């Protein structure tokens, strides 16, 4: 989430239970917001354990291996979304603290179970309305559509997040800041997010009576569907009761087809993040009339002049059964290459967050730039773009430069030498490929 520095240990038992919101007030109550652990960061190991388990079970049970290109794109979006947290405390908590410090009306006790449970309900209620508006207000959808852009539905999809979305969500939690201490809010805003990880799976079917109260994989599959019956439904975070109360609940019926109604057809991370912002910009200037221009921003993504606020249901593309996910086939060695370099990138990413307080601004900026370049280059490779080889050559050269001048460091013995050898080989291989492709393009022009 960014900005949490609490050093409280999270046991293995607590780590597992926090993924399902099964923790007790007496073990997750803190007097000061600075004492609240960064539960999301501590959950990283559990994310990957659950991801690996899902991959194994899905492959062994259903014969459905993970699509590496789509899965890595989702993980890339998760990395992308957290980069602003290197420099800034999470805007949700920072804005909450400001209101609490300046405008609170009463101060509920931070160590009361009643405060804990009230905050649980308040955060989940705020999330429901934020999530609903993120689908019903076009400018907010620009931040949320990233999460819906995957055409697969698995645990990697849960990590496909937008770096823009957090700048809209904070206002929906403001009312609690008039009475609920920031430390209690900071706990629940993290647990609410963590709970939503495990429901992104096709491996769990109906959960019986729990389906009436909790948001479950079945309910959330509907939310991610692009079938007409799935659109604008099941906004719950933890409790599905809000959808039942406000008329947005839809049960799972026919097989769900996942993704956007108009697929983006790319694995390039910047397009995954901002393609709808570009669409809004172009539509804004192409739409006549000032009031219509405002409607482009503040009405639904499906709105157009003369249409209802949320657009016309009949314009939602029907499912024919012939739909195929965007999937340019990559050779097995390229998929292994992508996974290997993403794991190497994660080491850079994790170290940057751990050492952000002692790294110089120049080092932080260079590492952020390298991370974004790596994510982009992997996207180019999986998209099979013409300049992929050239971009990957530049990326590998940049890594060697950064390591040589100590902008990339490691505490692991011999890893520096291994990196130097690996990236030198990659530079040569991709460089040769880039030269060969350039020669072939030149011949075609002659």
From Swiss-Prot:
A motif (Histidine box-2) lies at residues 144-148. GO terms for molecular function: glyceryl-ether monooxygenase activity; iron ion binding. Its EC number is 1.14.16.5. The keyword Flavoprotein does not apply. This is Alkylglycerol monooxygenase. GO terms for biological process: ether lipid metabolic process; lipid biosynthetic process; membrane lipid metabolic process. It catalyses: 1-O-(1,2-saturated-alkyl)-sn-glycerol + (6R)-L-erythro-5,6,7,8-tetrahydrobiopterin + O2 = a 1-(1-hydroxyalkyl)-sn-glycerol + (6R)-L-erythro-6,7-dihydrobiopterin + H2O. It is found in: Endoplasmic reticulum membrane. The chain crosses the membrane at residues 43-63, 110-130, 167-187, 339-359, 362-382, 412-434. Glyceryl-ether monooxygenase that cleaves the O-alkyl bond of ether lipids. Ether lipids are essential components of brain membranes. A motif (Histidine box-1) lies at residues 131-135. Its main location: endoplasmic reticulum. Its cofactor is Fe cation. One of its GO terms (cellular component) is endoplasmic reticulum membrane. It is a multi-pass membrane protein. A motif (Histidine box-3) lies at residues 220-224. Keywords: Endoplasmic reticulum, Iron, Lipid metabolism, Membrane, Oxidoreductase, Transmembrane, Transmembrane helix. It comes from Xenopus tropicalis (Western clawed frog). Belongs to the sterol desaturase family. TMEM195 subfamily. InterPro entries: AGMP_C, Fatty_acid_hydroxylase, Sterol_desaturase/TMEM195. Residues 118-248 form the Fatty acid hydroxylase domain. The keyword Electron transport does not apply. It holds the Pfam family AGMP_C.
């Amino acid at each position: 989430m960014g900005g949490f520095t609490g050093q409280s240990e999270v046991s293995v038992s607590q780590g597992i239970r926090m993924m399902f919101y099964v923790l007790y007030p007496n073990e997750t109550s803190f007097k000061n917001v600075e004492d609240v652990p960064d539960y999301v960061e501590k959950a990283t190991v559990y994310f990957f354990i659950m991801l690996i388990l899902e991959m194994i079970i899905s492959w062994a049970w259903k014969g459905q291996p993970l699509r590496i290109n789509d899965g890595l794109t989702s993980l890339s979006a998760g990395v992308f979304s957290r980069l602003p947290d290197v420099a800034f405390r999470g805007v949700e908590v920072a804005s909450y603290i400001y209101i609490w410090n300046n405008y609170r009306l009463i101060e509920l006790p931070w160590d009361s179970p009643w405060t804990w449970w009230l905050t649980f309900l308040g955060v989940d209620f705020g999330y429901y309305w934020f999530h609903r508006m993120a689908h019903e207000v076009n400018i907010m959808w620009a931040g949320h559509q990233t999460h819906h852009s995957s055409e697969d539905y698995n645990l990697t999809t849960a990590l496909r997040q937008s770096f823009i979305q957090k700048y809209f969500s904070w206002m929906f939690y403001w009312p609690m800041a008039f009475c609920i201490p920031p430390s209690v809010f900071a706990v629940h805003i993290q647990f609410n997010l963590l709970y939503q990880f495990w429901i992104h799976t096709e491996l769990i079917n109906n959960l019986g009576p729990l389906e009436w109260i909790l948001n479950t994989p079945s309910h959330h599959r509907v939310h991610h569907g692009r079938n007409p019956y799935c659109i604008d439904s099941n906004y719950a975070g933890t409790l599905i009761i809000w959808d039942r109360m406000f008329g947005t609940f839809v049960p799972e019926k026919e097989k769900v087809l996942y993704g956007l109604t108009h697929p983006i057809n790319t694995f390039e991370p910047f397009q995954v993040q901002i393609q709808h912002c570009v669409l809004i910009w172009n539509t804004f200037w192409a739409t006549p009339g000032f009031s219509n221009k405002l409607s482009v921003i503040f009405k639904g993504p499906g709105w157009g002049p003369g249409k209802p606020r949320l657009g016309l249901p009949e314009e939602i593309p029907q499912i024919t059964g012939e739909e195929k996910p965007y999937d340019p086939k990559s050779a097995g060695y390229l998929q292994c290459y992508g996974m290997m370099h993403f794991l190497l990138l994660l080491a850079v990413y994790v170290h940057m967050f751990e050492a952000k307080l002692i790294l110089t601004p120049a080092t932080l900026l260079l590492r952020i730039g390298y991370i974004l370049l790596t994510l982009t280059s992997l996207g180019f490779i999986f998209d099979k773009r013409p300049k992929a080889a050239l971009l990957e050559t530049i990326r590998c050269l940049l890594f060697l430069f950064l390591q040589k001048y100590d902008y990339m460091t490691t505490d692991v013995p011999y890893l520096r030498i291994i990196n130097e050898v690996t990236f030198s080989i990659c530079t040569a291989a991709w460089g040769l490929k880039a030269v060969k492709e350039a020669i072939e393009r030149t011949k075609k022009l002659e």
